[in-house]
Amino acid sequence: MEIRRRPPNPTVRVENLEYAVPHREAQAKNILEEIVWHKDIEIKNFKKIVSLEDLIKKIEKLPTPKDFYKNILESKIKPGVIAEIKKASPSKGVIRKDFNPENIAICYEGLGASCISVLTDKRFFQGSYEILETVRRSTNLPLLCKDFIISAYQIYKARVSGADAILLIAAILSDDDLIYLKKIADNLKMSVLVEVHNADELERILKLKSFNLIGINNRDLKTFKTDLKTSIELMHTYADIFLKQNIIPISESGINCAEDLESLRSIGIKGVLIGETFMRETDIEQSFKKLFTSI
């Protein structure tokens, strides 16, 4: 699935008149493309408030990031759980009205989650870097900044806000971008979870030989529907390669019951990222225990 970057001139002049109309190539083809295009604007606005140089100075005073990979690998719960804090989504709207990031983070840690994922996209998911900062103050678990990263600036901002790891999405980044952004994260000693949606994207990632955390997203980017067959089919083909290369495969999205977890664990999935299943339930603790006590 090709995700285009925002055209530099979203409007075109009509003859000599003093107005412009939208360029036909300036219309996003899908929600993912719309999100990515908005990131360009968002990053420019962030830079007006805090410069990259100021972020770098702040990072120099921070402790070493926590080990995301190790926490999943050594998790007592199998597969290891990346529990997500997410208020809303483009497809479902507000998922959790009673949204208290601090209490949710404390709950996740007490239940045995390996790591916590925090949505920081504001426009489409009602997240923020302020929420990430709140969660950082509330837990000792490694934190993943869950966003649509297209710029090094976002990585530095994530680190300053308390993230130990970032998400890179293969569908929105070229190979050169993936290598460059991974290098930035490596320099900051941050972990990188790279996300794929199909075999073509996974092949790209494996050829780069740079990633030891690979997330298989079960969500179709065109329809936003989820299907665990994505993880199952890719694991059937690539499980041995993951094992040989010490790659931790993580299944993301569409995990709703203990049977789902058992089927994923049985095919070699080492970690799961679960958000909406917890967020839509009034009692997160009960929802968590219902998923994990029987496996």
From Swiss-Prot:
User: Known catalysed reaction(s)?
Assistant: 1-(2-carboxyphenylamino)-1-deoxy-D-ribulose 5-phosphate + H(+) = (1S,2R)-1-C-(indol-3-yl)glycerol 3-phosphate + CO2 + H2O
- The EC number(s) attached to this protein equal 4.1.1.48
Instruction: Could you list this entry's UniProt keywords, alphabetically sorted.
Output: Amino-acid biosynthesis, Aromatic amino acid biosynthesis, Decarboxylase, Lyase, Tryptophan biosynthesis
The biological process GO terms on file are: L-tryptophan biosynthetic process
**This protein's pathway:** Amino-acid biosynthesis; L-tryptophan biosynthesis; L-tryptophan from chorismate: step 4/5
**An annotated Gene Ontology molecular function:** phosphoribosylanthranilate isomerase activity
- UniProt entry tagged with the keyword Amino-acid biosynthesis: yes
Key word Lyase present: yes
Per UniProt, the enzyme's principal EC class comes to lyase
Q: What family is it from?
A: Belongs to the TrpC family.
PANTHER family, per this entry?
INDOLE-3-GLYCEROL-PHOSPHATE SYNTHASE, TRYPTOPHAN BIOSYNTHESIS PROTEIN
Q: Which HAMAP family does the UniProt entry name for this protein?
A: IGPS_B
Q: Name the chain's protein.
A: Indole-3-glycerol phosphate synthase
Q: Which organism is it from?
A: Prochlorococcus marinus (strain MIT 9301)
